[in-house]
Amino acid sequence: MQERFFNYELISDTDRSFIENKYHRQDMPFDGKQRMKYHGYDYDESTGLSDREIMLGLDELAKKLENEHHYTIKSELFSYILDNTRIDINEHDYFIGIYTWDRVIDKHTIDPWQKEAYAKATLAVGNSKRNDFSKSGTAWALLDFDHTVPDWESLSTLGFVGILERLENSYTVVKSSGSITEKQELFYKCAKREYEALIKFVKRLYAYSLTKSHPKAAIVSESLKHLCEGAPQTTYDMLQLIYIYFMVSESVEHYQVRSLGYGLDNTLYPFYKSDIENRRFSKEEISRFIAYFMMQFSAMGNYWGQPFYLGGTNPDGSTAVNELSYLILDIYDKLGIYNPKIQIKVCKSTPKDFVFKALRMIIGGSTSIVFCNEDIIVKALMRSGATYDDATLAVVKGCYEYALRAKSIGISFNTFNALKPLCFVFSGGYDNVTGKLLGIHTKDVSEFDSFEKFYHAYLAQFDYVINENILPGKSHGRRSLLGCSPWGH
């Protein structure tokens, strides 16, 4: 590990140990794939219900709502959890605690609804090969709850309160036009219900913070007050907003947030610059906030890592790398962690010293860093119809997928085995695992007199697999999933 030069302590050993035990006990067995089923330290019981009590309450509420629209069911169950979960404002942490984080809503929402969506999709398209593709290792088609990215720009400029106001204003405009549908009315009502519950939750956190007198309490209280009333004002406010949104979306509503900001450096930079210029916080204090923020994701232990990205290019061609980009790398290196994982958007305008810094970190042991070729991202998105500006500002998410900011929705997950179509060329479309015809009939391989014809047959097989695999999702899966979630992503 290459030592970075901080002449101040980023996080005390006591606080670090505390956060490392916030989500699960370090001295107990742990399965990262089941990370949300654990708890670390105990929360104040007076702040809310236990997990079991909340699950019993959800059972009772879901029973009352069983004949209601999915929008209504989801929004009411979501609100119930935020109203009743235990909370924490701790002397060892700058970030809030939410106790019930095991997606307990799933029993009544995602679990039954996705089965319903698959059944309806299969019925709509007839004899779908989706199950056979899965059994044979050819392809997998699933509803995707794991690759969402919220509109961080709107959240950073409006906050939770401003998003709700924008929703109400949009509703008023559509309502006054006389063109609003019954379904739109219901969607508005339920989306409003969820954002009101979220704001109420933040107000509950704020009220609880006022009962604390430890050194961090005043800073936490002021930040929560900002988020109760409007948009984030400081770097710390924005970090707290990102964290709260992440926990509520990922662990309550079951939509994984697969990027922390539109580039963590670029989302935070306006706040960072303002904080320094107006002397709200020093660089040292901001460094600590970022360190405590990163430690949350390290401590959660997500087995596939929590991503965020840095760098990139502005539409005018200038680099998006800034002072904070370097500082974030330094903090990450100093902490010696591998989760969250960092994606760096690189192109010709990326400063070489920034790339070399990341490379030195990798050589020194900070190996959870990947480089994403921005030129390829831009070309690929523009081929799909995106403008240059939109493609340049594309968000990197998940492993290292990319998408347009606030203009795309990733709700279907399709994975393909590129070798299977090759097998189908040799077998005439028959699968050697299931014994079924999963491809198409093509000529016997011995009849091909050129590689080009062989390759054309391969592409034909692959094209068939792709279209058969995505057909159920195109037919019904998307509509059903949108029926599940009134909270926009």
Regions found by a protein language model. Give the residues of each.
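Conserved catalytic cores of very large enzyme subunits
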Residues: M1-E194, T211-H489
